């Protein structure tokens, strides 16, 4: 389906959201076949959006030379060119993208998830239930993949930029799919990628300090307020009772959502879980509401995944799906790089994407409970130029829970990975024999597995199935923790 945007529609949409300041040199009517913010993708007649910290006026000049008919910006850059001047160019891009694609989100059952940890796993619990109940693959946007009915593609952002996001919604409809489950990052709201998106369901999983830094959020309060926006932009709000700042989250949901459900571990919740039994693999647990009790089984390890599963059950029940389909859909979910357990000759390797305080804490506590007495080794690092407090938190947690730590590179960016490792080592503690710094991640994974003894557990944390490292502004190939572990174990 070909999409177009006329000047009258564009200006009307921007005025409706209070964004349009003026439209100098614009004729009465002007069709814009393409909409883009990439000067390299401009076609004749395009509307070009000047957005982003890296925008330079020469990008606009290139766009105009390539045939752009109009540009959108917060200030005039070219006095002769038609322009739509707006108060917030990122919001304007979201508004124009939705208008350009015909507001496809309004025709979807759109499920959005936010939280500091567990978004990806819960996304796939929900998706698998929907796939089972509906009898076909439903759409998903996650840190693992983007699937809208065509080919599944790798994702590099938790939540796509607004123009790509609206295209995903439109592609989903074009493939005859009516359900889409997606992760909604705090950055997605901060950068207005999901501005104006009407979610059918919004889930708030949990909250702890993360993504604080000069390139992300200036404070924890900013991080929290961005995540809170999902509760203000959904019809059904679902909240996990154990999250920090629960009362504020609940109040925001009650003020804006048509319906609010709470799930957790006690009977004060709308749905709660009890009677947890360890299985091999996974867990069986009982989900209760005021009128019923029902057993469910998951095969994923990690007790924290019971909370993720309960959230998925709460949402899909509220959407009217039968318990039998929910139980079948949730029973055998596996997410690449999330609690992937590999065992050989009495040795256990766990590949997990744990990368912040909340996820490391939950992972360590779960393993201590499910593998009592087993020595725990961990291989981990921290990314460059992002959330510097992670280095403190993860260092302290490794010092508290791990018997030995392999410190290595994890998307170092423009920083020296060895220096990041040395900084983390300073927080592990005074027992210097308990860690080693090996900046080459592939070599570190190989060595950690070679040194793993029967009865010991090794956590490969932070990268999961990702087959790249972010280095010096590039995506350098990396075999992935999961692939190296399988190779070294002969699996």
What are these regions (language model features)?
Residues 1-21, 44, 53-55, 131, ...:
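ATP-dependent carboxylate-amine ligase
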Residues 1-95, 272, 301, 415, ...:
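N-terminal leader/targeting and accessory segments in enzymes
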Residues 47, 70, 201, 236, ...:
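Well-ordered beta-strand positions
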Residues 69-74, 237-242, 379-380, 404-411:
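Short internal beta-strands
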Residues 69-78, 142-145, 242-245, 265-266, ...:
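Short, polar loop motifs at secondary-structure junctions
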Residues 73, 87, 142, 184, ...:
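Short loop/edge segments at beta-strand edges and connector loops
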Residues 77-80, 175, 190, 200-349, ...:
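Acidic, Mg2+-coordinating active-site environments of NTP-dependent enzymes
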Residues 95-237, 241, 245-258, 310, ...:
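Phosphate-binding loop of NTP-binding sites
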